[in-house]
From Swiss-Prot:
Entries under InterPro entries matching the protein: Nuclear_fusion_Kar5
Family: Belongs to the KAR5 family.
Stretches of the chain found on the membrane's Cytoplasmic side: 404-407
Gene: KAR5
Keywords: Endoplasmic reticulum, Glycoprotein, Karyogamy, Membrane, Nucleus, Signal, Transmembrane, Transmembrane helix
Organism this protein belongs to: Yarrowia lipolytica (strain CLIB 122 / E 150)
Protein's name in the database: Nuclear fusion protein KAR5
Length: 407
């Protein structure tokens, strides 16, 4: 039995190449935000959480310093906890330029976070899509392994069927040969019984002849007695001697005839029995041994086949359970992809609202130097991340359509 299963695996490579092409370029501000906060929309207590706000502002200020190629304190390079963050801010106070940049990031950190949210959502969507592609590849790999197991079981089943067919053919040939042997043995039995019947017939004829001679001897003896009663003593003696000689000759004849017949019958019977025993014992013993050895081998192969079938069933059950688990994981990943697409749509809506807010800020008059500095810093941040944000929006939209097509 031949089974066939094929799947074009180049689709996985093409999807990975597409994901690599859609990956946005690295951005310092986006990286800093990602390390600290995962979702800007979840910052409901953002104004109250000063530590989080300070940590984000320090990370964004460091990105500003790097972009402008401005030296900054070494304490701001390794921000791991609140103590290191405080040490960084204490050194930023020592320089007006450092402090102005930090303070501007502190005031506009939420807006900057939302500006980079699109590219971050694009990264998450691409990561989810990569997970879906990996899960699909694993699923098809499991399906290939499952199909190979099915083909192996099919080949094993064909081998078992062929073996049983050969065994049944051998049994049929053995029974036919035993039937022929039985017919031959019956013919030997009939021949031997026919010969025995002939020997018994000869013995019966010899006995009949001996009885006739005995009757003749009796009549002769009776005649001799009558003649003796009429003859003299000398004649009686001669007649008696002749009767004794005739009786002795007849006895010898009977003994010889009986011995010849008995020996001939025993010899023939012994030969017949020898032929019967040799033919029946040898033939039947050989066939019984062949059948017994064949049945023993058959039982051994059958036990081995049962063990193999049990092992294959166990492997098949494990494969099915693994495939079910992979399908469940694949379903969860697809759900995550859908959620990422919906989040991307919501993010686009929030970006529109953010643009409207920026427009409204542009329409207001500048009332203080502090507001002007904050406004300039926000414009610089928007200029730095604006290009990547636009690219992120376009790629996010494309990825949303791609994920929906994959689902």
């Amino acid at each position: 039995m031949s089974l066939s299963y094929s799947f074009n695996t180049t689709i996985f490579t093409e999807n990975r190449d597409l994901v690599a092409a859609l990956q946005p370029q690295t951005n310092c501000a986006r990286t800093a935000l990602t390390l600290i906060v995962s979702d800007c929309g979840k910052l409901s207590s953002f104004n109250e959480d000063q530590q989080l706000r300070v940590s984000l502002a320090v990370g964004l200020a460091v990105c500003e310093f790097k972009a402008a190629q401005v030296t900054y304190p070494d304490a701001c390079n390794n921000i791991e906890d609140w103590m290191s963050t405080s040490a960084c801010t204490q050194q930023l106070v020592s320089s007006p330029q450092w402090w102005t940049t930090y303070h501007g990031c502190y005031n506009s950190v939420k807006q900057i976070c939302h500006m980079h949210e699109a590219s971050r959502e694009c990264d998450r969507a691409l990561k989810t899509h990569s997970q879906i592609v990996d899960m699909q590849e694993k699923l098809h790999t499991k399906m290939d392994q499952y199909w190979e197991l099915v083909e192996t079981m099919s080949d094993h089943r064909d081998a078992v069927l062929d073996y049983w067919n050969d065994t049944f053919d051998f049994m049929s040939e053995t029974l036919a040969h035993m039937k022929e042997t039985s017919v031959s043995l019956n013919a030997v039995y009939r021949d031997n019984f026919a010969q025995a019947q002939e020997h018994f017939q000869m013995l019966s004829e010899n006995l009949q002849e001996a009885r006739v001679q005995m009757e003749n001897l009796g009549w002769a003896a009776q005649d001799a007695v009558v003649s003796l009663s009429k003859s003299t003593l000398a004649e009686q003696s001669l007649v008696s001697e002749r009767l004794k000689n005739d009786a002795s000759s007849l006895h010898k004849l009977l003994v010889l005839a009986h011995q010849d017949t008995t020996e001939s019958f025993e010899t023939q019977l012994q030969q017949s029995l020898t032929i019967l025993v040799e033919s029946s014992d040898n033939v039947l013993l050989n066939h019984v041994q062949q059948v017994s050895s064949r049945l023993s081998a058959l039982m051994s192969d059958l036990e081995e086949s049962q063990k193999k079938n049990m092992d294959m069933q166990h492997q098949l059950q494990q494969k099915v359970r693994t495939i079910n688990d992979d399908i469940e994981g694949f379903t969860d990943t697809v759900k995550q992809g859908l959620e990422a697409s919906h989040s991307l749509l919501n993010l686009v809506k929030s970006k529109i609202q953010l643009v409207n807010g920026v427009v409204s800020i542009f329409s207001r008059p500048v009332r203080s130097a502090f507001q002007l500095a904050s406004f300039i810093i926000m414009i610089r941040a928007a200029f730095i991340g604006g290009i990547y944000t636009s690219i992120g929006l376009v790629m996010g939209s494309m990825l949303g359509v791609l994920v929906m097509q994959q689902v």
